[in-house]
Design a protein with these regions (language model features):
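Active-site segments that bind and position negatively charged phosphate/pyrophosphate groups
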Residues: 1-99
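C-terminal charged capping/lid subdomain of soluble metabolic enzymes
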Residues: 86-157
Length: 157
């Protein structure tokens, strides 16, 4: 069986070469269908709980404005996995992220200079009432988010 991550790599390569190949079409169709199904059937409970609130909170910092939405959401996925203690999954995604220059750490987002207090401002925004980050099991606090970010930093380096 071919790894979906390998198909994604081939699809991006084909897109960059302006070649609408079968692989590219199938990967795009899969993304659109899966996103629609998750959003449609799962509603807010089926979405990546922390990734989008992390994205939204990162936009408080001007240093991140040059990055596309999906790039910041990709970082939010890693923060969520760190919050859940899924380090093997982070390792598995890390190679994939490297292939596409997706951020794995604060330095990749020009944020490696942030203090814990500055990270706490970001975490407070991500943890506002009503944010999907609270769909994660257990109590989600800004301190937990900062801790996950710092632990992710240690894990990546």
């Amino acid at each position: 069986m071919i790894s979906p991550l390998l198909l994604g790599e081939k699809a991006v390569e084909d897109m960059r070469n302006k070649q609408p190949t079968y692989t590219w079409i199938k990967v795009m169709e899969t993304n659109i269908m899966a996103g629609g199904l998750v959003g449609g059937f799962g509603d807010e409970y089926g979405r990546t709980a922390a990734a989008h609130p992390i994205h939204d909170a990162l936009t408080l910092r001007a240093e991140t404005h040059q990055f596309l939405h999906g790039v910041k959401v990709a970082y939010g996925v890693l923060v969520q996995l760190a919050m859940e203690g899924k380090w093997d999954e982070i390792d598995r995604l890390s190679t994939f992220y490297n292939t596409f220059n997706l951020p794995r750490c604060l330095a990749d987002l020009n944020l490696n200079h942030l203090t814990d207090n500055e990270l706490l401002i970001i975490a407070n925004r991500a943890c506002e009432p009503g944010e999907s980050i609270h769909f994660l099991p257990g109590e989600v606090t800004p301190q937990l988010v900062v801790s996950a970010i710092r632990n992710l930093e240690k894990h990546i380096y």
